[in-house]
A protein has these predicted regions:
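Long, hydrophobic N-terminal alpha-helical segment
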Residues: 1-28
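Short, basic, glycine/proline-bearing loop/turn elements
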Residues: 23-26, 57, 78
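C-terminal catalytic "cap/lid" subdomain
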Residues: 27-34, 49, 107-111
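Ordered, amphipathic secondary-structure segments that act as subunit-interaction surfaces
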Residues: 47-73
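Glycine-rich, aromatic-bearing surface loops/beta-hairpins
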Residues: 64-132
Length: 132
């Protein structure tokens, strides 16, 4: 992640996500669920506040208005980092796969709940950007 630049994307995905097929670089975190991984990553990863949205999740197939438990947990983590007002959007499954394919890296977690996937757009690290 240190090699990532402004605008690069990072996918944090569940254990059932086809990370090896989709990801250029796969980071395995089998001992952490996706919200825990997100929480840790946000301590060193500023989100891009110049794009809307900088956070993308995966839409529930057949029910685009549903909010799965992992997404509720992602929102709680974002709120805990002072990012609760940040807009985010859900992508359809294959659109999420395409974005993950273009991501700098895919972090495959041990998350077993469905739809435990989130994409982050990296912001700028500078002396004016407080790290969460």
């Amino acid at each position: 992640m240190l090699s990532m630049g402004h605008g690069d994307e990072l996918a944090i995905v569940d254990a059932n996500f086809p990370a090896a097929t989709v990801g250029r670089r796969v980071i395995a975190l089998p001992g952490a669920d996706a919200p825990t991984a997100l929480d840790a990553i946000l301590t060193v990863f500023p989100l891009d506040d110049s794009v809307n949205p900088a956070v993308l999740t995966m839409e529930v197939a057949g029910d685009p208005t549903a909010t799965p438990d992992p997404v509720v947990a992602f929102f709680a983590v974002l709120t805990g980092h002072g990012l609760g007002d940040l807009p985010f959007r859900a992508l359809r499954r294959y659109a999420f796969y395409e974005r993950a394919r273009d991501a700098f890296a895919v972090v495959r977690t041990g998350e077993l709940r469905p739809y435990g996937n989130v994409l982050l757009v990296k912001g700028v690290v500078n002396s004016y950007t407080p790290m969460p």
